[in-house]
Swiss-Prot record:
Keyword Secreted appears in the UniProt entry: yes
Compartments where found: Secreted
GO CC annotations, alphabetized: extracellular region
GO BP terms, alphabetized: defense response to bacterium
Tissue: Expressed by the venom gland.
Protein name per Swiss-Prot or TrEMBL: Cupiennin-4a
Source species: Cupiennius salei (American wandering spider)
InterPro entries per UniProt: Cupiennin (IPR035164)
Keywords (A to Z) from UniProt: Amidation, Secreted, Toxin
Length: 27
């Protein structure tokens, strides 16, 4: 359903955000 799609997208975005923040921390 729509809820699952939303969760899937949220996970993808969260991963991108985390890796982005992690890279900024490393610099």
């Amino acid at each position: 359903g729509f809820g699952m799609l939303f969760k899937f997208l949220a996970k993808k975005v969260a991963k991108k955000l985390v890796s982005h923040v992690a890279q900024k921390q490393l610099e």
